[in-house]
Structures are given as C-alpha cells and as structure tokens.
A protein has these predicted regions:
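NAD(P)H-binding glycine-rich loop region in Rossmannoid oxidoreductase-like domains
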Residues: 41-88
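Mid/C-terminal beta-alpha module of Rossmann-like enzyme folds, strongest
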Residues: 210-258, 292-297
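Alpha-helical substrate-binding/gating segment
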Residues: 175-183, 191-225
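Glycine/proline-rich active-site loop of Rossmann-fold NAD(P)-dependent oxidoreductases
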Residues: 139, 151-153, 164-173, 207-217
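Conserved Rossmann-fold NAD(P)-dependent oxidoreductase catalytic core, especially the SDR/UDP-sugar
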Residues: 90-132
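N-terminal Rossmann NAD(P)H-binding glycine-rich loop of SDR-like oxidoreductase domains
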Residues: 3-23
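C-terminal amphipathic/interface module of NAD(P)-dependent oxidoreductases
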Residues: 262-297
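Conserved beta-loop-beta element that borders a ligand/cofactor-binding pocket
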Residues: 110, 143-166
C-alpha cells in the first residue's frame, strides 16, 4: 500500500513508519519544510496541502498534534493543543474529500481523553463523551475528520490510551525513579490507567488499514489497571521497592493542577471493544507481559 503519514517523526509515528516499511509498504511523510524524496510538504496554518500530491494514495494516517504533557497548560498552550489537532485534521479531511481518486481509508488520531474522568465505569466506543478540557479537545478533533467520511472514505478515529515504550512518554519519565527504588503510586492509586504497548499500538494501526472497521476505535490493551497495580507491577519487573505514595501537591506544583489531574490523578477504565471484535490479536494483553517485553526483563 502507498500510505501517507503525518506526525511521522513523533513517538508513535517513528515506530509505525519503520514497521510499515519493513512490511513492504510505500510510506510518504507529510513535512513542514521543503520536501525530500518520500515526502510531501504541507503548511496547516496556511491551509496548504496539494491534493494532487496525494493522488494514488491507498491510506492516510494522521498522527500529528502538540504533546499533551510537554508544557504547563497556559491559555496559549491549551489553544496550541487544540488547534494543532483541529486545523491539521480539517485540512487533511477536506483535502481527501476533494480528491478525484480518494484513499480507501483515513486513520485519524484521537485519544481516550474523550471520555473524561469516569471512576470505575467501564468505557467502550459507545460510551458518552466527558466534560473535561481534553474531552472537549478530542470531540472537536474527531469532528474535523467528518468531511472524509462524508465523502465515502472509511474513516477510523484512533482513540489512543497511554502508550508504553521506554523510548518516550509516561514509561520513560517514570522508569528512572522506579529503578532507584523511588517510585510510588499517585495519590490513593485507585485511578484507572488504560495503557497499550507500543508494539500493539502500531500493530493495531496497521491492522486497521485493512480491517472492516470504521468510526471510533479504542487503542488500549484489554486489561486496564489501577495506578496502584501499575506501580506494583513496574516495581516487580525492575526488582525495586515502590512504597512511597506521591501526594497530589508535589506534581500539581510542578505541572499545574489541571495537567497533573488529567495525567496522574484521574483516569479512564477503557475496553477495546471494537478492536477485539475486529479480530486483532494483542501481542501484550497484560501489563506485566508488556513491561517485561519492553524492558527486556
């Protein structure tokens, strides 16, 4: 397949491009500078994406967006989080809709943050949306993909959970503390963490290129855990204690209250119902299996 990818230099994008190329696909990257071979230049802020450059494409995968946990949520960064998703998605979806030879599938990024903090409730793709900042961002983000589906292109909304990889994200940030025996649960540890290994994240995305699935798909492992379970499992895998709970005031002072709450002290108990129904077979269905594989323990 000829596959165009935005966000190819990101944490998920790099691994995805590598696997797709290993499997014989022709991958073309969207870049915001002068394009080299195997690249297409675009400028989302200026609304520039040449539809003719996408002709002959079998699939488009859209993964770009400002990092949720990269900076404190100032009003300007909140706007960047939103617009880096909505403007880019709108441009790609509308460009696809205008093409003479449209791709067969559009896989567009989203996140399980769309459900908001929900306590013990088990959440699937048909669950209602939440009312938090991230829920609002995700809802608008998904809405901008609609022109592609309205034009008859199979559109999948990739509601990604916490992606585990030692190369970046939450696991990379926590690992040094746990290796020193300084890890601990956040607050009471009862908040749910719906995680997925990087191998299953990219495996599921590749699976969805051809699976007969459209609409929202939760990209999470089938066995979410509480933060206390995550903490004890990671400590066991690295063979270090993790006795000291981390009180809310410390992360909130560093990250800001809203960001700390969203990333550390609230969560969602998400089930990948659509992915399971599609026949995808998880490489790492449980957390301990995933961590031992990722950390080579």
């Amino acid at each position: 397949m000829k596959i165009v990818i935005s966000g190819a230099s990101g944490l998920i994008g790099k691994s995805l491009v590598s696997q797709l190329q290993q499997h014989g696909h022709d991958v073309v990257r969207l870049v915001r500078r002068a394009a080299n071979t195997g690249e297409i230049m675009w400028d989302p802020k200026a609304g520039v994406l040449d539809s003719s450059a996408l002709e002959g494409t079998d699939a488009v995968i859209h993964l770009s967006g400002a990092g949720i946990g990269d900076k404190r949520w100032t009003s300007s960064y909140r706007r960047e989080i939103l617009e880096s998703r909505t403007i880019t998605t709108s441009l790609i979806a509308n460009t696809i809709a205008k093409m003479n030879r449209k791709p067969s599938v559009f896989l567009s990024g989203s996140a399980i943050g769309i459900y908001g903090p929900r306590g013990e409730e088990q959440l699937t793709e048909v669950s209602t949306h939440g009312t938090s900042f991230l829920a609002d961002v995700c809802e608008q983000w998904e809405h901008e993909a609609k022109p592609a589906s309205d034009a008859g292109v199979r559109t999948v909304l990739l509601r990604t959970g916490i992606v585990l990889t030692p190369q970046g994200g939450a696991l990379k940030k926590q690992l040094p503390l746990f290796q020193l025996g300084l890890g601990g649960k956040f607050g009471n540890g009862k908040q749910w963490q719906s995680w997925i290994s990087i191998d299953d994240e990219i495996g599921a995305i590749e699976h969805l290129l051809t699976a007969n699935v459209s609409g929202a798909v939760n990209l999470t492992a089938p066995n979410p855990v509480t933060n206390a379970e995550f903490t004890s499992t990671l400590a066991r895998v690295v063979k270090r204690p993790a006795f000291l709970p981390i009180p809310p005031f410390a992360p909130k002072a560093i990250l800001g209250g809203d960001l700390a709450d969203a990333l550390l002290f609230t969560g969602q108990r998400v089930i990948p119902a659509a992915l399971n129904a599609s026949g995808y077979q998880f490489v790492h269905p449980t957390l301990e299996v995933a961590l031992r594989a990722l950390l080579k323990k």
